[in-house]
């Protein structure tokens, strides 16, 4: 006769207490603990073999015009934010930022290229089509580029959107708090970010 208790998921075998509810929530979240190569090495060394997922990322400070990274953010986030802040107030210019790093206006891909270049995450400007192959697919922990190949690209840094498209046609690169449609966009992210 088989042991039925061995086949019962831990979340079903817990009593109804506040502590049990906490365990149910933690076990139910797949991202809470991940078994990785370092976790496997930890098991060999006598550890549990699990690594905690990174903590929730703190949002950027935003004063309505400029963004500021928190002191706990990695240095590269500070570089990205500083580079993006330099472009705030520049006008939209089709093709801007592709031939000259410090142009007098920027389009969507030119502004994203400039920000990534200044943080040493890109070695040359890319078009929105080329960004479809940039770095890694999927959203990043700190930085996510949203690419609609051949049409538009924008980025989010710690949840704050840096984009050339907003409520007024012809606005250049700005930090945006208003939501926008993500239909047709594919997320990409720089490695480790």
Question: Where are the regions a protein language model picked out?
Answer:
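N-terminal secretory signal peptides
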Residues: 1-31, 38-46
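C-terminal segment of N-terminal export signals and the immediately downstream linker at the start
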Residues: 26-30, 46-75
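Short linear capping/connector segments at secondary-structure termini
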Residues: 63-66, 95-100, 130-133
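...with weaker cross-activation on analogous glycine-rich loops/strands in unrelated enzymes
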Residues: 70-73, 81, 113-193
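Solvent-exposed, acidic/flexible segments
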Residues: 70-77, 101-109
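Solvent-exposed, polar/charged alpha-helical surfaces in well-ordered, non-transmembrane soluble domains
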Residues: 78, 82-86, 109-114
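Active-site nucleophile-His-acid catalytic modules used for acyl/amide transfer and hydrolysis
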Residues: 86-105, 119
């Amino acid at each position: 006769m088989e042991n039925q208790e061995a086949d019962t998921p831990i979340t079903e075998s817990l009593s109804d207490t506040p502590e049990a509810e906490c365990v149910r929530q933690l076990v139910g979240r797949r991202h809470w603990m991940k078994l990785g190569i370092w976790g496997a090495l930890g098991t060999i060394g006598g550890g549990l073999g699990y690594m905690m997922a990174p903590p929730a990322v703190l949002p950027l400070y935003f004063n309505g015009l400029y963004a500021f990274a928190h002191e706990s953010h990695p240095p590269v986030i500070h570089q990205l934010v500083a580079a993006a802040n330099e472009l705030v107030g520049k006008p939209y210019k089709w093709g801007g930022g592709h031939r000259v790093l410090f142009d007098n206006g920027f389009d969507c891909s030119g502004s994203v290229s400039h920000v990534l270049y200044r943080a040493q995450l890109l070695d040359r400007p890319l078009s929105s089509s080329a960004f479809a192959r940039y770095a890694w697919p999927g959203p990043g922990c700190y930085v996510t580029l949203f690419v609609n190949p051949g049409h538009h690209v924008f980025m989010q840094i710690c949840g704050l959107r840096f984009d050339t498209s907003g409520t007024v046609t012809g606005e250049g690169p700005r930090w945006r708090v208003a939501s926008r449609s993500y239909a047709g966009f594919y997320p990409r992210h720089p490695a480790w970010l």
